[in-house]
Amino acid sequence: MKYLVYDSTFEGFLTAVFAVFEYRYNEVTIVARHRFAPLLFGEEETVYTDANKAQRVLTKIEQCWGKEGVAIVLRAFLSEETHMEDYLLEAIRLMVKYPEGKVLENFAHRAIASIRKAAKSVEREVHRMKEFVRFEKIGELYFAKIVPEYDVLPLVVPHFKTRFSDQQWVLYDPERGYGFIYNLHEVLPFTPADKHFGALTPATADAYQTLWKTYFQHINIAERKNAKYQMRNMPKRYWQYLPEV
């Protein structure tokens, strides 16, 4: 068995799918780096994310399944369900084999059923987050801490950017250790150095304003490229496929 280990990004996963077809792998499984355990048996291969290869896979999916199909794949991926990468690979293999077939409608197939169930769950979680997330206003800053069941933070950010376009805000997921900052100009992903960030609400507005000035406003270009939070950042070009964003 060959194990394709990727960087946990959606583009990394699509690159791994590309590799499966490029090298005609049969006995293969795709696994995120943070979930991969050293093997006694089997062959490990690191997949290096390639945006061009990822786009080719995405284009093929859209050609066969349309934007709705891409949305289903995206949502299922963000579910973080165990073995979801392999379910998606299985579905894509069926798509290539039966390009005119309604593969995603075959709910009797275990992989398809798992994908559709996960995608639906993620979609519901996105709507739930939009409805129930509440920002706390501290000084000039709005702050919200959320722990969604699925990794939906990138999918709800556009909603809050539109809703609070005239306010500075922070949306943070302490369970996954990353968040997004809106500074009135752009939305930026961030990963705090302190693993306990957001665990306690500062007692005063002044304390939080100090945090804003000393931490958030000094994020530089190098930090924006930090691989840890890029793992969680859904590129904006994928938002077009998701009605909820």
Where are these regions (language model features)?
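Short, hydrophobic/amphipathic alpha-helical patches that form generic packing surfaces
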Residues: 12-23, 89-94, 155-162, 209-217
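Internal, well-folded beta-alpha domain core
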Residues: 101-192
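Charged, alpha-helical interface segments at or near domain boundaries
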Residues: 31-127
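Glycine- and acidic
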Residues: 1-3, 142, 194-197
